[in-house]
């Protein structure tokens, strides 16, 4: 009996501790230029509007990353982001919507749990997973004050990119809110638009949840996500990389093997069949050589004549 009471007390303590660490929920968007199969399956696993635990969210992210089909894995933290922002002010996310709409794989989650531990570690475990799984050795960190002046790298090495955007202030003034969203949307476009490769995977969320309330049935960027069929995964950008980066033709020797070159035999039949052509080639060659010889002889005579004239003139001047 005492043992059972101890177990119950332990469970209640863990629940209370978890609740004390929970600081809210944030929406999340995941998308990839190239097809990342398996993402759509999670739509059936998560109830619409339900809070998705951080562990489950990380599992979805790892599924997206594990295909290693991107030249840049981008993690975006947008402090102060609310579900209402992505629903009520969807038009202000002009460039984010465009990136989602033109992706091959995309998913959104309305509510992902955020704890104090998550705020401290943020994308740390996912960054480590991406670098280990996809053999990525370089990481670029872009702080809020660098978002406006970011200059892209020019090398072609795969990278993990961490973007920390300026915070959305918890203002309910519609005009101010729209201006903040539009400004950060432009900042994100400035960064993503300068990446040397169009093949990217992006995870966009917030580790500093907003306290602004959202409608219970709010949808994330509905116009952007409506283009996707949740029952069919389709590669929509199969030609994008080839069109953006024209490749070089592989070297191929004219003859693969000298031993395979068939020798031309000047037999009687060959000579009879090609007598006219061979005669024309021979005559043309002789005439060409004769013409070259005459030209050379003529130039030689002109040089000798000019030399003699110059000598005569010098002699006359001397007298």
Swiss-Prot record:
Its main location: endoplasmic reticulum. The chain crosses the membrane at residues 270-290. Residues 19-269 are lumenal. GO terms for cellular component: endoplasmic reticulum membrane. Residues 297-319 are annotated as: Disordered. Residues 291-319 are cytoplasmic. Residues 1-18 form the signal peptide. It is a single-pass type I membrane protein. Belongs to the BIG1 family. This is Protein BIG1. The gene is BIG1.
């Amino acid at each position: 009996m005492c043992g059972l009471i101890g177990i119950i007390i332990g469970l209640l303590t863990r629940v209370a501790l978890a609740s004390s660490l929970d600081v809210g929920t944030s929406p999340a968007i995941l998308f990839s230029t190239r097809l990342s199969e398996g993402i759509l399956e999670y739509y059936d696993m998560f109830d619409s509007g339900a809070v998705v635990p951080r562990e489950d969210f990380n599992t979805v992210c790892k599924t997206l990353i594990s295909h290693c089909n991107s030249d840049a894995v981008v993690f975006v933290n947008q402090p102060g982001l609310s579900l209402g922002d992505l629903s009520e002010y969807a038009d202000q996310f002009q460039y984010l919507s465009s990136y989602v709409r033109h992706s091959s794989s995309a998913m959104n989650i309305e509510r992902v749990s955020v704890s104090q531990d998550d705020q401290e570690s943020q994308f740390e475990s996912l960054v480590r997973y991406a670098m280990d799984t996809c053999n990525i050795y370089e990481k670029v960190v872009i702080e809020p004050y660098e978002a406006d002046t970011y200059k892209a790298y020019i090398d072609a090495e795969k990278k993990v990119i961490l973007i920390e955007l300026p915070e959305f202030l918890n203002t309910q003034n519609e005009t101010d809110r729209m201006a903040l969203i539009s400004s950060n949307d432009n900042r994100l476009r400035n960064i993503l638009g300068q990446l040397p490769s169009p093949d990217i995977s992006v995870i966009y969320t917030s580790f500093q949840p907003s306290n602004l309330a959202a409608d219970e049935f709010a949808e994330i960027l509905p116009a952007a996500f409506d283009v996707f069929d949740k029952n069919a995964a389709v590669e929509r950008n199969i030609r994008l990389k080839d069109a953006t980066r024209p490749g070089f033709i592989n070297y191929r020797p004219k003859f693969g093997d000298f031993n395979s070159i068939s020798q031309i035999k000047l037999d009687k039949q060959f000579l009879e069949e090609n007598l006219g052509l061979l005669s024309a080639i021979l005559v043309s060659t002789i005439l060409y050589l004769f013409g070259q010889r005459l030209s050379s002889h003529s130039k030689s005579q002109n040089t000798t004549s000019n030399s003699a004239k110059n000598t005569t003139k010098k002699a006359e001047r001397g007298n």
